[in-house]
Amino acid sequence: YFEKFTENNCVGIIYNEVEALSKLTGDYNFTNLCAATSLGLYFGIDFHLIKKAIEEYTPTNMRSQIVKKGDKTLVLDTYNANPSSMKVSLENFNDFIGTKTIIIGDMLELGEESVTEHSQILELAKSLSFDEIITVGPHFKEVNVSGVAFLTTQDLINYLTENEIHSQNILLKASRGIVLEKALEFIK
C-alpha cells in the first residue's frame, strides 16, 4: 500500500505512485508517515494535500531536526535520549552518505544501569562507521576513557571554538539536561 524511499538522508512515502518526501530522517519516521497518511486518507483528505503537508513540515523541536551550516548537515536530536532512542539514532545516522561525526551526551535518569547502558551505546557507536565520536557528560566520560570526552557542554564549546569538525554530517544526541544544543552555534 505504502512504499518507502529516501533522498538526501530524508525519508519519504509513495502512495499510488506519488512521492512525498519529508524533512525527517530515519526509517522509524516512515512508520509515522504511514500512520499520518492513513489517518488523512481515512478521513477523506486527498493525498496531494497530505503530500503538501508532509513536504512542508519542518521539525523545529530538537527532535531529529536537520540544520544546514555551510556544507555540513547537522541532525539535532537533543530533546530526549534513552538507550533505545540513542540506538535507533546511531543506526539511522550510520546510513547517512558521506563523512560522519557523532556528538553524544549523557542519557540521564538511568540509575544503577547508567554505566552499563552508556558502555553499550559507546560500543555500538564504535562498531558503526563514524569518522569521529565525541561524548559529553560525566557518565560517558567515565566509560569513554580512550576517546574524545568532555565533562560538560561548556567544555565541548571551548573545544569547538579552537577546533573544526571536518565531517559533512554531524549528529548531536543527548538528554535535555545536557543542553547539547548550545554547542550548535560553535560548530564551524
Predicted features along the sequence, with ranges:
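A short, compositionally biased
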Residues: 4-12
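ATP-dependent carboxylate-amine ligase
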Residues: 8, 18-188
